[in-house]
Regions:
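A short, hydrophobic C-terminal helix/tail in secreted or cell-surface proteins
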Residues: 212-216
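Short beta-strand segments
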Residues: 82-83, 121-123, 169
Length: 216
């Protein structure tokens, strides 16, 4: 249901674009039956994070989601653009995507036996304007894990691009003793609120999550 998108391929009908390269967000939309295209934003996230670092994390994820969606909306003005962002926080400390197995192991050692939070923000842009945004926070507690368990998990799932260094949608869910909130939010996007917004804005239909206008 997805494809990579170039500027020349835009159609003059209802188009949904996910402004993210996140496999998890793509998977959730596909599982919901949404027909969409993908255009990864070229937003300088590090620069924006510095500018908004004093805000609560629940607001930061929305601002980052908006920046991504706005960037793509400028290029595809008539499209409906979905932006999303996620932050994993332990004791007010932001845990970045590890980027390597070694750093993933370090992150999981910090999270082992501890409560932490996953903040997810999502927005919808059209004509370079934000027409809806939302954020949600989930509290999680990880089991106390041995070093061997942590290393074994990292070797099995290689979660180097995951916020918190775990993939909750697969084996990572076994790491937790307690989760208070939506699994979709833990995976990186508050899916049900997003689907409700798309329906209320008449972007998708009520029963089948496809564009109300036929696509060529």
């Amino acid at each position: 249901m997805t494809r990579s998108l170039e500027s020349s391929s835009i159609k003059p009908k209802v188009q949904i674009i996910l402004a993210s390269g996140s496999e998890s967000r793509k998977q959730m939309l596909e599982e919901a039956g949404v027909i969409f295209d993908v255009k990864v934003s070229d937003t300088d996230e590090d620069k924006i994070k510095k500018q908004i670092s004093s805000l609560p994390f629940s607001e930061q994820v929305v601002d980052l989601a908006k920046a991504k969606a706005e960037s793509v909306s400028r290029e595809f003005n008539e499209a409906v653009v979905i932006g999303g962002d996620q932050m994993c926080v332990l004791d007010d400390r932001l845990l970045h995507k590890p980027g390597s197995k070694e750093k993933a192991i370090e992150s999981l050692k910090l999270l082992s036996g501890q409560k932490h939070y996953q903040h997810s923000g999502v927005c919808i842009f059209k004509n370079q304007s934000c027409i809806w945004h939302y954020s949600e926070t989930v509290e999680l507690k990880m089991h106390s894990l041995s070093e061997a368990e942590i290393i074994n998990y990292v070797e099995m799932e290689n979660p180097i691009n995951a916020a918190g260094a775990y993939k909750f949608e697969s084996l990572g869910c076994n790491l937790f003793s307690y989760v208070n909130g939506s699994s979709h939010t833990v995976r990186g996007m508050p899916l049900i609120p997003l689907l409700n917004a798309l329906r209320e804005l008449n972007i998708i239909s009520c029963l089948l999550y496809t564009s109300p206008s036929p696509r060529d």
